């Protein structure tokens, strides 16, 4: 049976170090833990979920381009690229796939340079400060958005 929706999860630089890097800020869960929980939830929701993590901006841009016509929604934690990447913003706008921006920490309670996002104003929504649970909330919200859109 074909999945109801296809959702792409993108994770940016240094997220491969989750569980080791600053656990007081980012939590103890590894990226594999987070993606595993997401895969379980996706199966329950009848969603096909694919994941990519990269420390290279161009790889994330290429993956976004390749998603056109094959993905219904994107969940993205751009990490440090949040504050610097016009290229990722333009790629997301170019493919016109709705997306939710995710951050493990509350970026607004951190250093001032982390307060600006190049993506937030064009995202369907932003989830920050809820740790690894934010990914699951984002997946659930994406599915609800897609269900509402397909019923109209």
UniProtKB/Swiss-Prot annotation:
UniProt binding sites for substrate: 77, 83, 90, 104-105, 114
Site keyed Transition state stabilizer: positions: 21
Domain of life: Bacteria
Matches recorded under Pfam families: DHquinase_II
One GO MF term attached to the UniProt entry: 3-dehydroquinate dehydratase activity
Enzyme class: lyase
InterPro entries: DHquinase_II, DHquinase_II_CS, DHquinase_II_sf
UniProt family annotation: Belongs to the type-II 3-dehydroquinase family.
Organism annotation: Tolumonas auensis (strain DSM 9187 / NBRC 110442 / TA 4)
Gene: aroQ
Function as written in the Swiss-Prot or TrEMBL entry: Catalyzes a trans-dehydration via an enolate intermediate.
Record carries keyword Cytoplasm: no
UniProt keyword annotations, A-Z: Amino-acid biosynthesis, Aromatic amino acid biosynthesis, Lyase
Assembly with partners or alone: Homododecamer.
EC number(s) on file: 4.2.1.10
NCBIfam families: aroQ, PRK05395.1-1, PRK05395.1-2, PRK05395.1-3, PRK05395.1-4
Protein's UniProt name: 3-dehydroquinate dehydratase
Record carries keyword Amino-acid biosynthesis: yes
Active site feature: 26, 103
